[in-house]
Amino acid sequence: MAETFHFSISMISRGKSKSAVASAAYISCEKIKNEWDGEVHDYHNKKGLLHSEIFLPENVPIALKDRTTLWNSVELNEKASNAQLARNFIIALPKELSLEENKDLIRDFIQENFVSKGMIADLAIHQGNDEGNGNIHAHIMTTVRPLN
């Protein structure tokens, strides 16, 4: 297994001039318009995305499985100029495991630590520029409070 392990946590907040929509567009390599400020965040040409998926707790509207709907709902729900919008996690994954094994590993982690506690989680697994499985890592964004 890995000799070193990276795990970082940060807050995405307007007080730090950050946007949940911009962060979601970046990690998912998508183009998403932020309905809060009208800005379009376009990362569809970004390379390295291996997998993305949204996890919903029970009793959450299925419409929030759509990334644009989810993060725009968060942006529009929070009114304060310094609002905390999402938690952001970056986790190194074991390069010794296959992509499918890493997906299973991170899915279990997300279910146990976030979804079971009522949070929505947005996962993106990235591959660095290395050949093979080097620098494989997960980006996870979670909601700060329940949405319904």
Question: Could you say what each language-model-derived stretch is?
Answer:
Residues M1-N148:
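N-terminal nicking endonuclease/strand-transfer module with a His-rich metal-binding environment
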